[in-house]
């Protein structure tokens, strides 16, 4: 498990171990190639990398005119370059060892675009395109590559985002986000995790080059 916050990653790893699983945590800034290289060197001391889940991401509030070049670069570096860096580290290893699985976390923003989320929408569109390209390029090497495109998911990331950008109006904005979903609520993290587990399992061995919306009807059922 890699995270820019090594202590947070260690906490999750401890929970996994306590539940009977195996996990180790390493600090890593996915936007920095050297940080990724060092982290993957440590990981590879433990054995093969068979599955890579790219889940690091940040957002930014702003339309085209409200997005400065530093804003754009910051989102791109984490959401796009971060996945690129991790795939650059993992895919050659998978290729040399007979195959593997790459799962990228995209967003419905990458398919439909979201108002006031110019940089974020752009970055997630790039994630979808990268997924398709990697799936095509490495099919012969038995590497499957898919992505998941969630709508809004209720996580601490969302709570922090609302506190930073809508101080004093967090609950009002939270309710608006819930109502924006045709299904009437945001997704639970466990619902995204269940799909991720499936796509990384043998049950999904015939699935590659696919973008999976998990959006409570956001793309197709809004009136």
Feature names for model-found ranges:
Residues 1-11:
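Conserved glycine-rich Rossmann-like NAD(P)H-binding loop of the short-chain dehydrogenase/reductase
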Residues 6-7, 27-39, 69, 190-191:
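The beta1-alpha1 cofactor-binding region of Rossmann-like NAD(H)/NADP(H)-dependent oxidoreductases
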Residues 63-64, 68-73, 177:
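Substrate-binding pocket helix/loop in short-chain dehydrogenase/reductase
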Residues 87, 123, 131:
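Active-site helix of classical SDR
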Residues 92, 136-140, 205:
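Alpha-helical segment proximal to the catalytic Tyr-Lys
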Residues 107:
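Residue(s) in the substrate-gating loop at a strand-loop-helix junction
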Residues 112, 197, 208-223:
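Short C-terminal tail/terminal secondary-structure segment
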